[in-house]
Amino acid sequence: MTVVSCEIQDETVVVSPLYQDDCDEERGDQECSERVVINISGLRFETQLRTLSRFPTTLLGDPRKRMRFFDPLRNEYFFDRNRPSFDAILYYYQSGGKLRRPVNVTMDIFMEEMTFYEIEEEAIDMFKEDEGMIIEVERAMPDNEFQRQLWLLFEYPESSGPARMIAVVSVSVIVISIVIFCLETLPQFREDTSANLPLSNHHTTNGTTLHKKPNLFTDPFFMVETLCIVWFSFEFLVRFLSCPSKPAFFKNAMNSIDILAIAPYFITLGLELAEQQEAGSEQAMSLAILRVIRLVRVFRIFKLSRHSKGLQILGQTLHASISELGLLIFFLLIGVILFSSAVYFAEADDPESGFSSIPAAFWWAVVSMTTVGYGDMCPVTIGGKIVGSMCAIAGVLTIALPVPVIVSNFNYFYHRERNDEETAVYTHVTCGQQNASFGEFKSTSDSRQSLTKSEDTEEDSCETIRLTHFNPFEHYTGKLTDV
């Protein structure tokens, strides 16, 4: 059963709330129970008008929007769209807002179909969460124009040419800082080693020879480090002063890494100034503290992730796979305790065995389960070798289980990044009807290069083709559909 012909006039005045048509009292029940036929590329679906009117802001729920696709000759709505996807679209109206992607429809095609039918954003966000997708959060920008320009320069390198130049300078300074951090540990450059100190730096107190530490301010590595810190501090302050939200700024992990990259220098500087008035034993203690603090400088390498898409994808993959990684560590912990205990009791009768205790066997169990096998500890008895074989096999199986999930997450983030890059390069022509506003009904066939269905019923319907699916003004996302 199809809708009556008077629906053409009635639908222009039927504007529905969320779950009820605004029908007249006399014929409300009759109109709300009317059935409508929807033709999707030759496959007909039949439903009630009140089912579609549950979501009046969507394409099918708004009578004026769907009127553009009404075929008065066949008394149906025609959409040249993907047919398998419409099962889920119609179920969205029937279930009151539930979206379930068909198994034979890819994610990109189903996302295009939801966009075409103007499904509500809240339902799309819930669908993305159910599919395990990360919802893109709109980037906040400062209200002040000058702050906005500074924020774009230092936070988004792809925004302009000067921003790319600043990113190149920042990456260069990071690389120089990491190289200096590594070179200063070479024996020929380590001035804090007593063998390399000149005689003038040795003095004797109460028969004990003390080594006077060279002046840090004359160290060329310290000078280069100072120049790098000047740039890091300038970059950090500019980004902090121009950020749109100060609390959100400190919650960002990358900004915490920036603080860790800058703080060791100032702590080192403070300890160096304090050491000049301390005794020799206190200097040795300060030197030990200083070495621990300098170790934090290695975290500067993570500053490169701000300018590297690959490191960002890796970080997103690890964050999305945190539950799988936790499960992997838990399984490894169980295996380490189990096999270290087994190998200890298997090797207990051998006096030359290196497994003196169960905690001492933890190291062997870890390197065996991870298939590293250093060989510094190995079983010598038959029982110990059997336990070692089982430990290696169990380690391979334990590590292999969560790997496909982690690889799947990496592929998702990698392909999403590639799609975002393609979106910025290519232009898009959709494969369905033009998604114009419902108020555009004037004759624009010459400018839009389209043919509209003739209202003259004497013409042959086969010669009046409606080509409303061509839109040269949208952007191509690199995605294909099967319609």
From Swiss-Prot:
Extracellular side, ranges: 187-220, 274-324, 375-385
Region (Disordered) location: 440-459
Sorted UniProt keywords: Ion channel, Ion transport, Lipoprotein, Membrane, Palmitate, Phosphoprotein, Potassium, Potassium channel, Potassium transport, Transmembrane, Transmembrane helix, Transport, Voltage-gated channel
Tissue note: Expressed in oligodendrocytes and astrocytes.
Pfam families attached to this UniProt entry: BTB_2, Ion_trans
InterPro entries: BTB/POZ_dom (IPR000210), Ion_trans_dom (IPR005821), K_chnl_volt-dep_Kv (IPR003968), K_chnl_volt-dep_Kv1 (IPR003972), SKP1/BTB/POZ_sf (IPR011333), T1-type_BTB (IPR003131), VG_K_chnl (IPR028325), Volt_channel_dom_sf (IPR027359)
Residues spanning the membrane: 166-186, 221-241, 253-273, 325-345, 354-374, 386-406
Residue ranges annotated as motif Selectivity filter: 371-376
Modified residues (Phosphotyrosine): Y426
Record's bilayer topology term: Multi-pass membrane protein
Motif (PDZ-binding): 481-483
UniProt superkingdom: Eukaryota
Phosphothreonine: residues bearing it: T430
Subcellular location, principal: membrane
Domain comment (free text): The N-terminus may be important in determining the rate of inactivation of the channel while the tail may play a role in modulation of channel activity and/or targeting of the channel to specific subcellular compartments. The segment S4 is probably the voltage-sensor and is characterized by a series of positively charged amino acids at every third position.
Name of the protein this chain belongs to: Shaker-related potassium channel tsha2
Species of origin: Oncorhynchus mykiss (Rainbow trout)
